[in-house]
C-alpha cells in the first residue's frame, strides 16, 4: 500500500462523524443485550457487569460512515438515575424499559425529568425502546403507554426484543443517530444566522 493510500485512509477515519449514545434504563431491562446485539449481531442473555462500559463501533447509517461511541450505563438500583457526567457526555440517549416491568417504565420517565432539570434549555435527542416485546404474556406496560410517553418526550419509539430482532435493534441506534445529526444541522443553521452572530 502506498503512503498516499495510507494517508487517504487516515483522512477518511478522521473525518468520520462521531455520535455518542448513552443507553439508559433500570437494571435488568436488557441495555447490555441491546448494545451487544447492535455491536456484534449476537444475543447474549446474561450480563454481570458492575460499572458503565463504553464501546466504539463504526457503521453505515443512510450510506454515511458513523463512529458510534456507546455508553452502556449500569445503575445499581431503580433509584440511581444517570449521572450528570453521562448526560453531558452524550449526544443522544437511548431510553430503554422492559414491557414486563412497570418500574422500568417509570425509571425512564424519571431519567428524562432529571435531564430536564439538569439543563432545561437542552433539546437532547432521544429514542424510546420497549424491550422484551416477545414476552407479551408478562406484559405490564401497554404499547399505547409507550407511544404516549414517546409523544410526551417528542421522540421515536419502538417495541423490540434484543433476543430475536437484529434489524430492529440496529434501527433503534440508527434512528437516534439520525436525530443527533438533525439536531447538529439545526444548531449549525442557527449559529449561521446573521442575528445569532450579534
PLM segments and residue spans:
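Post-kinase regulatory C-tail/linker adjacent to protein kinase catalytic domains
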Residues: 189-198
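TRAFAC-class small GTPase G-domain
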Residues: 1-187
